Each structure stands twice: as C-alpha cells, then as structure tokens.
Amino acid sequence: MKKQYCYIDGVPSIYWGNPTEKTFISIHGVGSNKEEAELFARIVETKGYGVISFDMPEHGERINEKNTLRPWNCIEEIEKVYRYAQSISPNISIFASSLGAYMSLLTFSEIKLEKALFLSPILDLQRLIWNLMSVYNITEAEIMEKGEIPTPAGITLYDDYYKYVMAHPITKWKTPTEILYGEHDNLSEYKIVTDFADRFDCGLELMKNGEHWFHTEDQLAYFSDWVDKLVTD
C-alpha cells in the first residue's frame, strides 16, 4: 500500500493509503511507534479509509526526547494531527491503543468523531497510578516532595504528571466506541473497562487468553478479524 512519510506541524507522521473522505487517526501507546499502524491501515484501506499515524513524544523518531510524554503535550500534538485530518477528510475516526486511548479521551472529550476503536485501552490513569503507588508504598506527599520517583516497574512517577491526571478525570465521551480487551490484560482492570463501556454505551469484546500487548500470531489474527468486522465500507 502507499506509505507517505511527512511532518504534520513538526510531528513525524505517516499517511497510509490514498487521500479519501474517510480517515482514521492512529494513536499508539507506550513503546510503540507510527510504523506499527501498518496492519490496521492495510485492513481499513480495503474499506475506503486512509490512516494517519504519528510518533508520540519519546517514541519512534523522537526516542531521544526527555520528559515530553505528558498529557498536555500529547493533547497538543493529537490536535495538530486532527486539524490536518480535518483539512483533507470530512469524516474522522480514531484507532487508539493502551495509553493512546487515554490521551484520546482527554483530547476529544467534547468532540463527537465518526467512530473510535480502542485496543487494550487505559481508561482510568488515576486508578493505574494509585495501584502503582500502593504496590511500591509511595505516597502523594513523597511524589510532591521529590518531584519524581522511579519505580521497579520501569515507570517514573512525576509530580506534574500526577497533578494533571488527578485534576482531569474522564467524565465525558461522545464518540461511538468499540473496545477489544484481552482476558489477561495486566494493566487495564476488567471492571474499569466494563464500567466505561456501560457508562458510555460502548461495544466490548473480550479475547480469551489475550494480553495487554497483542503480539502473537493468534492475537493479531483476532485483532484483524475484529477490525474487519467493525469497519465497514
């Protein structure tokens, strides 16, 4: 398929396929990059969609950035890509995975998109942070005092990030949404996902033996079938 590298207002991006009236913005999670949207792009191209993927802060071409993967930075950059998508296509949808889903919830809380597909979404970052603090006996006062606290899980807790997340709970979501969740997801609690789905009338599919990171042959095949089923011409 056609694959065009570009910069959208300074953000390293790829446009997959040919320009069309229907566009998906692909928003990846931690440890991923814009190139990993290829499988998704190949599937939805057959349904008449183009796809824009981009590197989130500290990922892909931006791997050497430091301390830029903050919600306010991510929102600003998703908005840049969204504005560009609007300039070329009247119908905008999103595909987001893991932390990318959380950043999407913040960015588009007041906007009704055509549709959203969430894979292994982080839907309540407050809860995830609190769980991490509980496991490693870290208090809010310690985070505020030290500014940043590395954890054995490889995740560093920052005071500015913590304060932002606590001040911005997810209370609104207007976009018709479908969620694919793995039975053995170790980051997103099933109850959090089901509560979100019930609250915002989302479709939810559970993959038996699925994980947070869909990477095995069986998992990717299941994911592909899920996308193919939900995205129509």
Model-based region annotation:
Residues I111-D195, R199-L206, E211-F214, L220-D233:
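The alpha/beta-hydrolase serine catalytic core
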Residues F95-S104:
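Gly/Ala-rich beta-loop-alpha elbow adjacent to hydrolase catalytic centers
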Residues A41-I63:
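Conserved alpha/beta-hydrolase
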Residues E21, G29-S32, E183:
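Active-site glycine-rich loops that stabilize anionic/oxyanionic intermediates
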Residues V30-R42, K191:
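The serine-hydrolase catalytic nucleophile loop
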Residues H59-I88:
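Catalytic nucleophile-loop/oxyanion-hole region of alpha/beta-hydrolase
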